[in-house]
Amino acid sequence: ELGLSEAQQTLLINNLRDRVIVRTDGGLRNGKDIVIAAALGAEEFNFGTIAMIAMGCVYVRKCHLNNCPVGVATTDPKFRAKFKGTPEMVINFFDGVAREAREIMAKLGVRTLDEMIGHPEYLKQREVPEHPKANLLDLGPVLKDVIPDLAKHQGVGESYLSRICKA
């Protein structure tokens, strides 16, 4: 989260935000993660391992050895025969992620993901009674709104695209 927040803040301060598409990756598992990443400035979200788990991966970390015991990550016919995954399993997972993100945004009064992008004011640090030391963390720099009342997300500007791409 810190890197994402710092990238967003730096791009805004230097008036470069409309020239970059910010993508986040690693550790995204649910709709809440999407909403948090969007509020911190992410516009695109990559899912890796969790999508494989939705297909049936049991996470034995043997992908590179070509002997995945459930056939998710292998070309060996012996192991491929064990694969029971379907496209619907992954579709159902992502439908759930999208539904959860929409529910959270609705509670915040946000209608679209674009309205959420780059607005850390929707986030607040919560108290964690079961982990007292976590309450000592100062998330102020991560949740800082460096340029209040500014449109934080406008997508990559057309003028910039026209300068770097020939028609």
What spans do the regions from the language model cover?
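Active-site or pore-adjacent capping/gating segments
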Residues: 45, 53-120, 124
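Glycine-rich phosphate/ribose-binding loops and adjacent secondary-structure elements
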Residues: 1-81
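Terminal amphipathic helices with adjacent charged low-complexity linkers/tails
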Residues: 110-166
